[in-house]
């Protein structure tokens, strides 16, 4: 299980929740959605390893299941418990959260069990990320339409980014094809372009320094693309994995930027960006790809 990346999922919840609440009130609902997201995200990681155990035995034999440290049955039970905990936490928040969580379960299992090795695999992973951000926004009354902008547009752009990331990372354990990587780069930048377009044109509820925000986003985008180009020029597994790790870390920063733009509250943005600390720290001992 690539535990460090669970904090990237939590950054989705922070952004989504603030888009519909402007603060962390009510704190119980916010906390339960963090638990729901973490449970569902980690369950997806576990089931991914369960269904990928034969491939991992060849490409990643040190992982817990192929190495024999954890049995397939034990891993499946753990994945089921995490998934139930995630759905249960969402159900406690409310009906809309339960609906989004159930959609997310379907997307997770659809990816892990059926679609991962097909051309629809990256699409489904993007849908998972889209739904995770919408889960953060879902703590609203049932009569309120959840599926509206700005959360719908932001979630779509972030989902497109993750779709491209997944495409880019599909062959990370072995030599990747340049054409494959270039395709991933194009989708990644389509998602990033959607975010930049929204930053520049959306009627944000509070006054912001657009130049500063676009400059911050530009730094993140340039950092991502530098690693992408390096991996394309030399598509060795190590370079592709570094690019993927850079994108996962940058994802948190993109969410932090959107948090600041929506709330103009630097504290909320710093809290979001602070999720980088456990991500980076744990990645020294645990895999992120």
Segments (PLM) and residue ranges:
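Membrane-interface helix-loop-helix junctions at boundaries between adjacent transmembrane segments
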Residues: 110, 114-122
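Short, amphipathic, aromatic/basic-enriched membrane-interface segments that mark the entry/exit
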Residues: 1-4, 49, 65-75, 92-97, ...
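Acidic (Asp/Glu-rich) catalytic motifs at the cytosolic membrane interface
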Residues: 36-74, 165-178, 282, 286-287
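Divalent metal-coordination and catalytic microenvironments
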Residues: 1, 52, 256
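Multi-pass membrane catalytic core of lipid/isoprenoid biosynthesis enzymes
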Residues: 35-37, 53-108, 126, 148-156, ...
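Alpha-helical transmembrane segments
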Residues: 40-44, 116, 218-221, 275
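C-terminal membrane-associated helical module and adjoining short loops/tails
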Residues: 130, 136-289
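Membrane-embedded alpha-helical segments that form the functional core of polytopic membrane enzymes
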Residues: 9-51, 57, 83-91, 95-111, ...
């Amino acid at each position: 299980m690539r535990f460090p990346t669970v904090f990237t999922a939590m950054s989705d919840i922070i952004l989504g929740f603030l888009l519909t609440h402007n603060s962390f009130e009510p704190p119980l609902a916010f906390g339960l959605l963090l638990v729901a997201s973490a449970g569902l995200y980690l369950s997806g990681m576990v089931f991914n390893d369960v269904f990928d155990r034969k491939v991992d035995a060849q490409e990643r034999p040190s992982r817990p299941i192929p190495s024999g440290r954890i049995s397939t049955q034990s891993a499946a039970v753990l994945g089921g418990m995490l998934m139930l905990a995630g759905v249960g936490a969402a159900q406690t928040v409310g009906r809309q959260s339960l609906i989004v969580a159930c959609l997310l379960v379907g997307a997770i299992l659809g990816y892990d069990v059926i679609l991962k090795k097909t051309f629809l695999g990256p699409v489904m992973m993007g849908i998972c990320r889209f739904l995770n951000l919408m889960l953060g926004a879902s703590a609203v009354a049932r009569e309120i339409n959840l599926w509206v902008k700005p959360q719908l547009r932001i979630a779509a752009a972030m989902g497109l980014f993750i779709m491209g990331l997944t495409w880019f990372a599909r062959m990370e354990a072995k030599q990747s094809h340049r054409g494959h990587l270039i395709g991933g780069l194009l989708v990644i930048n389509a998602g990033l372009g959607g975010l930049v377009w929204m930053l520049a044109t959306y009627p944000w509820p509070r006054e912001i320094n657009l130049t500063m925000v676009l400059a911050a986003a530009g730094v993140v985008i340039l950092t991502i693309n530098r690693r992408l180009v390096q991996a394309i020029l030399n598509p060795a597994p190590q370079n592709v994995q570094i690019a993927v790790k850079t994108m996962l870390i940058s994802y948190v920063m993109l969410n932090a930027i959107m948090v600041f733009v929506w709330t103009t509250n630097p504290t909320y943005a710093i809290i979001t960006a602070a999720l980088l600390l456990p991500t980076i720290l744990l990645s020294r001992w645990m895999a992120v790809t």
